[in-house]
Amino acid sequence: MKRVWPRIPTISNVCRARSIYSAAQENAYRSSVKLIQEYSEKVHKKLQAKLLENPSETSPEIERLQVLSQINLPEVRSKFHKKEIDYTNPVFLYMLKQQWEDYQKLLLLQRLEQMKVIKDSGIGSFSPSVDVQLGFNPENNDSITPGTILPSTVTVKTPWLSVLPFNCKKNHYSVITLDLDVPNYETNRFETHCNWLLTNIPIEASKRVPIDTSKAFFQYRPPIVHRGEDKHRILTLVLRQKSSSISIPSNALVRERFDLSEFCSIYDLEPVGAHLWRSGWDSDAVALLSKHPSVHEYRDIRVERIPA
């Protein structure tokens, strides 16, 4: 006897279930958006009341209310996901800060601790609060990953620098680049030399352009690494100024044996951002550095063996 299998309408049941779930999800989404908009309007009214009390006020409480009134709106989240960033809006700066703290800040701090940069530079306790992007190719915006070893063909050029503070205020900064591993064969110690120094740089989040490096107290000088030396740690620090302008006499500073803590103390500077890369000797170093205008003389140091 031939067995007959009953026909089960599985496809129609699945489609029916999917349509039920889709309708439920759509209703849940609309209800969520309605709640978000109601909360946003409530916070916005509180913000308007604060601004009516003092229209010129730009306190942290005002920025907090601006962020709360927009951060959960679907259109704001969509623009942030598509990288349509409005740098004049505090809510986008807040989300950028969250994104930066979740990865880039942790990576930077890990490299600084791993390579003992904080201890050897003398900056003491340090918690960066601005995003520092640095690169050597002006044709693209690809920043160097902190701790990367770069060849001399790259580092012989003046780098570009971009700083993003996560607030709408305009502040003035100084930027300094230090070589932490310059050997002194007479004292058998390592010294810190200054490779680059910029001062009185106005920076605000709304103006996303690379820093003007044409006016510098010390023009950029590439790191000088001789044959046989280990990799040099090149630290770039962004220092926030208390005033819009600091005046440094032309003969007050020298590149050699640079004391960072004393420099920050004299001119009242606060480290708020950093970047790190490394440089080593390679076959192109002699030819490139000998032609650089900031390097007066490049020659391999002759190290004699200490007599027994």
Curated annotation (Swiss-Prot):
One biological process term in Gene Ontology: mitochondrial translation
GO molecular function terms listed in the Swiss-Prot or TrEMBL record: structural constituent of ribosome
First and last residues of the transit peptide: 1-17
Name of one Pfam family that matches: PBP
InterPro entries given in the database record: PEBP, PEBP-like_sf, PEBP_euk
GO CC field: mitochondrial large ribosomal subunit; mitochondrion
Keyword Lipid metabolism: no
UniProtKB keywords: Mitochondrion, Ribonucleoprotein, Ribosomal protein, Transit peptide
Origin: domain of life: Eukaryota
Cell compartment(s), UniProt: Mitochondrion
Family per similarity comment: Belongs to the phosphatidylethanolamine-binding protein family. Mitochondrion-specific ribosomal protein mL38 subfamily.
Known partners and oligomeric status: Component of the mitochondrial large ribosomal subunit (mt-LSU). Mature yeast 74S mitochondrial ribosomes consist of a small (37S) and a large (54S) subunit. The 37S small subunit contains a 15S ribosomal RNA (15S mt-rRNA) and at least 32 different proteins. The 54S large subunit contains a 21S rRNA (21S mt-rRNA) and at least 45 different proteins.
Described purpose of this protein according to its UniProt entry: Component of the mitochondrial ribosome (mitoribosome), a dedicated translation machinery responsible for the synthesis of mitochondrial genome-encoded proteins, including at least some of the essential transmembrane subunits of the mitochondrial respiratory chain. The mitoribosomes are attached to the mitochondrial inner membrane and translation products are cotranslationally integrated into the membrane.
UniProt xrefs under PANTHER family: PHOSPHATIDYLETHANOLAMINE-BINDING PROTEIN (PTHR11362), PHOSPHATIDYLETHANOLAMINE-BINDING PROTEIN 4 (PTHR11362:SF82)
Name of this protein: Large ribosomal subunit protein mL38
